[in-house]
Amino acid sequence: MGKTHACTDPHHHVHDAAGFVAAVERACNERGLRLTAIRARVLGLVAQAGRPIKAYDLLEQVREGEGAGAAAPPTVYRALDFLLANGFIHKLESINAFVACHHPNSAQHSVPFLICDRCHSATELEDASIVATLDAAARGLGFAPQAQTLEVHGRCARCARAR
């Protein structure tokens, strides 16, 4: 199996949200995409969250910052859809929440996540062999994978020590 690296510090958190948004803006420019103000705002909130964040919480924060009429739910959902489709954020399906992608300049990729059921942290694992093994196993069974979501629930190291 390939080398596994966890992207976490100590949890899935981008410490320089403005720098992260700027990196995504550069990636958008390189790809001919447009990072609108609302997309940048939603991306910044996801990056600052320090934990997986739900769409409703994002909507609430956008409204707090810009006024109650500033953002309707479809606006935030469209921003999330854009950020997801272009690989700038990940959706944790099992908890219906979002986290920033630690590789905004790379092409879309599937990564496994470790999700702590106690503190709700999410750790992005970098191990291409895990994804490749799943893909190969599926194809070996005649299955044509379209997308992969691998989420492992348990306790992070900090919570496991705190029993």
Set out the residue ranges of the language-model regions.
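Non-DNA-binding regulatory cores of transcription-related proteins
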Residues: 85-163
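A short acidic, leucine-rich amphipathic alpha-helix
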Residues: 57-63, 76
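Basic amphipathic alpha-helical segments that dock to polyanions
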Residues: 76-86
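N-terminal leader segment of winged-helix/HTH proteins
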Residues: 1-34
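Short capping segments at the starts of secondary-structure elements
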Residues: 48-54
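Pre-recognition alpha-helix immediately N-terminal to the DNA-recognition helix
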Residues: 40-45
